Amino acid sequence: MKQSKLLIPTLREMPSDAQVISHALMVRAGYVRQVSAGIYAYLPLANRTIEKFKTIMREEFEKIGAVEMLAPALLTADLWRESGRYETYGEDLYKLKNRDNSDFILGPTHEETFTTLVRDAVKSYKQLPLNLYQIQSKYRDEKRPRNGLLRTREFIMKDGYSFHHNYEDLDVTYEDYRQAYEAIFTRAGLDFKGIIGDGGAMGGKDSQEFMAITPARTDLDRWVVLDKSIASMDDIPKEVLEEIKAELAAWMISGEDTIAYSTESSYAANLEMATNEYKPSSKVAAEDALAEVETPHCKTIDEVAAFLSVDETQTIKTLLFVADNEPVVALLVGNDHINTVKLKNYLAADFLEPASEEEARAFFGAGFGSLGPVNLAQGSRIVADRKVQNLTNAVAGANKDGFHVTGVNPGRDFQAEYVDIREVKEGEMSPDGHGVLQFARGIEVGHIFKLGTRYSDSMGATILDENGRAVPIVMGCYGIGVSRILSAVIEQHARLFVNKTPKGDYRYAWGVNFPKELAPFDVHLITVNVKDQVAQDLTAKLEADLTAKGYDVLTDDRNERVGSKFSDSDLIGLPIRVTVGKKAAEGIVEIKIKATGASIEVNAENLIETLEILTKEH
């Protein structure tokens, strides 16, 4: 395909509003353009990459018996009222009315639609299982769209739904999807982890997230590609290396989520769901009597601990939340942080939010900084992290401004429900006892859920079982963020290309090393001088030969400076560059492997044979 015929509007500079490298490079390399806040046009290069990813998905889903279809994006609100999500989904839901004043939404997900279709068509367990999916644009009214395709108001998603007559059958399909997702993301060239996830607004029972890891850009060997003009990193002057390090560090590490994973096992979880190894301890010290002490001007745990000369681990942090309009007291060891997802899940609450200071005063009789679990009103619900029960003679707020109590002992001085509600810390033992927890940032690219009967119960989707009884259909849900795959791939495969000019100056610029399976084209064929007829003829022959061998070829036939062509080639990021230059009359061309920066001159007649050898090596 001729580059002059494509819309590839590359830019000479990075866009000023981009904070993450994937957003900057997608815009600069001419892959996307923003039409409105959080709404993007996918230009030819991006569209080709997305279509290649769709092909990978379709091939893997066919292996597990998943069937593609297409549902409408414009949905009646009545379906969402049936499930209860019309009221609970929140402000992100696009709501609109037609000319008859009927309520509609733009679908962010399609559980209700697929449930209704199957409910109306399937009557017997003999018609199950069903495994359906679609690839479609979704809509979410994000309050603050950001980071390019990672947080948008319109996005492309693959959402699949499976329908079963029992949970055992669901388990089989769930495992099929887990393996299919691993195959898809592996083929896409992603470094990813399957982690324990939160069902969130989907209402799932069990769930697993697939996170593309976005590591810090500190390893020069990984992130920097040297041109053939530079033998090794050691040849680069120290001051230039420092500039390169600064450029790598200048771009924010993307990823909405923090992942906690074990250094020695397969355990991995979203930080919201991560736990650690917990061992109850036996109390050995005698229990002191409660004593009220004045703690003037002490509002925080560290201030109280310093004032009383105790360790923060000997204090109790007391928080008040409102869960579905009911007050709930949450307790933590002083140096721990609350994990509101764990608390919300434990309470099975639809809404959970921190109480205001006015609400805290009404409940405790004191303001923030002096709250505690002792002598609360009878019937008060207290949920404490499991570590709290190991404390002896702890310090807690006295529910009196400017005062705390010492000698607080769980069980004697207050009763609580003990459960894991804390945020894990890096370096703690993995819950399986193997290795310690490390953190990484990640981009969620896929999520699978065991929905169970969440939607079939609320929407009356039943079948007749083996005994002729009406039972709810058991469901699974399986999503992949198709458009954000482009961001994830670029985040992982962006590179800083460094070269040395004939004058001895060092220059560096960002580009992409697209993995072969997702690159919009396989080969970038560049004619240095389009006015040279010999070069033109050789280019045409090579394009035809490569295409005949199954390569997708992008031919740069533009009448541009060679430096501009090479810069655009680095930006676009195709795996192989073939240059027809000054030696065209001799039948000599240059091959450059983008991933390594390695280049070689070959006879044009041996080009395809050489490419087959080189691509096997890389």
Curated annotation (Swiss-Prot):
Keyword Protein biosynthesis on entry: yes
GO MF terms held by the record: aminoacyl-tRNA deacylase activity; ATP binding; catalytic activity, acting on a protein; proline-tRNA ligase activity; transferase activity
Assigned EC number: 6.1.1.15
UniProt cross-references to InterPro entries, sorted A to Z: aa-tRNA-synt_IIb, aa-tRNA-synth_II, aa-tRNA-synth_II/BPL/LPL, Anticodon-bd, Anticodon-bd_dom_sf, Pro-tRNA-ligase_IIa, Pro-tRNA-synth_IIa_bac-type, Pro-tRNA-Synthase_IIa_type1
Reactions performed catalytically: tRNA(Pro) + L-proline + ATP = L-prolyl-tRNA(Pro) + AMP + diphosphate
Keyword set includes NAD: no
UniProt keyword terms in alphabetical order: Aminoacyl-tRNA synthetase, ATP-binding, Cytoplasm, Ligase, Nucleotide-binding, Protein biosynthesis
Listed Pfam families: HGTP_anticodon (PF03129), tRNA-synt_2b (PF00587), tRNA_edit (PF04073)
Main localization category: cytoplasm
Superkingdom classification of source: Bacteria
Description of how the protein assembles with itself and partners: Homodimer.
Domain notes: Consists of three domains: the N-terminal catalytic domain, the editing domain and the C-terminal anticodon-binding domain.
Membership in a protein family: Belongs to the class-II aminoacyl-tRNA synthetase family. ProS type 1 subfamily.
Protein name: Proline--tRNA ligase
Organism the protein comes from: Streptococcus pyogenes serotype M12 (strain MGAS2096)
